[in-house]
From Swiss-Prot:
Binds 2 Zn(2+) or Co(2+) ions per subunit. CDD domains: M20_DapE_proteobac. Pathway: Amino-acid biosynthesis; L-lysine biosynthesis via DAP pathway; LL-2,6-diaminopimelate from (S)-tetrahydrodipicolinate (succinylase route): step 3/3. InterPro entries: Bact_exopeptidase_dim_dom (IPR036264), DapE_proteobac (IPR005941), Peptidase_M20 (IPR002933), Peptidase_M20_dimer (IPR011650), Peptidase_M20A (IPR050072). Zn(2+) 1 binds at residues 68, 101, 164. This is Succinyl-diaminopimelate desuccinylase. Its EC number is 3.5.1.18. It comes from the Bacteria. Coiled coil: none annotated. The keyword Cell membrane does not apply. Keywords: Amino-acid biosynthesis, Cobalt, Diaminopimelate biosynthesis, Hydrolase, Lysine biosynthesis, Metal-binding, Zinc. The gene is dapE. The active site is at 70, 135 (proton acceptor).
Length: 377
């Protein structure tokens, strides 16, 4: 079976067990290909994380492909139909950890760039790659550190295409032109431990906090807007008690998350939470962690270039969306760059038997190449 350039490179990347934060030579494989077509290669290692900044050209505007070589753990190996790091093609589908999220997109980016440079050796501006091995993990020493380095030397990205798996039913049907913000909190409510038979001598933090938690769950934080759904509040963990049936717990710990729109700020959400907790007279402390600001790329050069390319290659009228979790786009957008996410179908990401349709890989490459044509030819 003759494999296309994109499929061959995908297979090579998928053989690397690059579980966060281990890159396992994926970036070297990509860098070697890019160096051959004139990219300046700059590895950036921070802590235990490998990052790659590769650039062809010295002038603006700068078009940047962004993505990650790391993958999530496999889960139970005996639940997979084949070795997750020995990629297999079965019934037209390519199986392997990272096949959808997002090594096939990385391969498509490299091949698209090779083809574009061959046709346009003196293209306008610059093409760049920003690749990390820590997107699925803490994301502390990855993209954010590369962006900080670029900012210090005033190296600006004009347009950024992140290869996250954005498609839902068919290739290119959804492009992410923004993401909601993500605000996490750990709430600790203090009570007084005691015997369940003597509740008057204790204070049950579960009982005291329950009305406040119910109110938080029922609160309408905003109604969203044309780009973003309404802000969502979700409790992810609750813990209290010693495990004994006859002890009133002395404290309650609750972890919750906001996925929020541009209609509110993180500070406004914090203030409203404190108002509700204070109204219920709780003795509490709360630790906040803002893991991502919301961002939005309005219709403009990058959106138009992507929509035109998708329509030309697949015949699909693409839809703009801001749904889903956070991505590394949240670190790139604050620099002023236009950011889009466009990749393969996301139906099996992080799952056992993760896979992607082989017949989507060459069209994705064509889309990426045509976006380059639309912006830099």
């Amino acid at each position: 079976m003759n494999h296309s350039d994109t499929l061959s490179l995908s297979l090579e990347l998928l053989q690397q067990p690059s579980v966060t934060p281990i890159d396992h030579t994926c970036q070297t494989i990509m860098a070697d290909r890019l160096a051959k077509v004139g990219f300046h290669i700059e590895p950036m290692r921070f802590g235990d994380v490998d990052n790659l900044w590769a650039r062809r050209g010295t002038e603006g505007p700068v078009f940047c492909f962004a993505g990650h070589t790391d993958v999530v753990p496999t889960g139970r190996l005996d639940a997979w139909n084949s070795d997750p790091f020995a990629p297999e093609i079965r019934d037209g589908k390519l199986y392997g950890r990272g096949s959808a999220d997002m090594k096939t997109a990385l391969a498509a980016m490299v091949v698209a760039s090779e083809r574009f440079v061959a046709k346009h050796p003196n293209h306008k501006g610059s093409i760049a790659f920003l690749i990390t091995s820590d997107e699925e993990g803490p994301a502390v020493n990855g993209t954010v550190k590369v962006i900080e380095t670029l900012e210090k030397r005033n190296e600006k990205i004009t347009w950024c295409l992140v290869g996250e798996p954005s498609s839902t039913h068919k290739l290119g049907d959804i492009v992410k032109n923004g993401r909601r913000g993500s605000l996490n909190a750990v709430l600790k409510v203090q009570g007084k431990q005691g015997h369940v038979a003597y509740p008057h001598l204790a204070r049950n933090p579960i009982h005291e906090a329950s009305p406040a938690l119910a109110e938080l769950c029922q609160t309408v934080w905003d109604n969203g807007n044309e780009y973003f759904p309404a802000t969502s509040f979700q409790i992810s963990n609750i813990h209290a008690g010693t495990g004994a049936t006859n002890v009133i717990p002395g404290a309650l710990e609750v972890t919750f998350n906001f996925r929020y729109s541009t209609e509110v700020t993180a500070e406004q959400l914090k203030q409203r939470v404190h108002e509700i907790l204070d109204k219920h007279g709780l003795q509490y402390e709360i630790v906040w962690n803002l893991s991502g600001l919301p961002f939005l790329t309005p219709v403009g050069e990058l959106v138009n270039a992507a929509q035109t390319a998708i329509l030309n290659v697949t015949g699909t009228e693409t839809e703009l969306s801001t749904s889903g979790g956070t991505s590394d786009g949240r670190f790139i957008a604050p620099t002023g760059a236009q950011v889009l996410e466009l990749g393969v179908l996301n139906a099996t990401i992080h799952q056992i038997n993760e896979h992607v349709d082989v017949h989507d890989l060459d069209p994705l490459t064509d889309i990426y190449e045509q976006i380059l044509e639309n912006l830099l030819a």
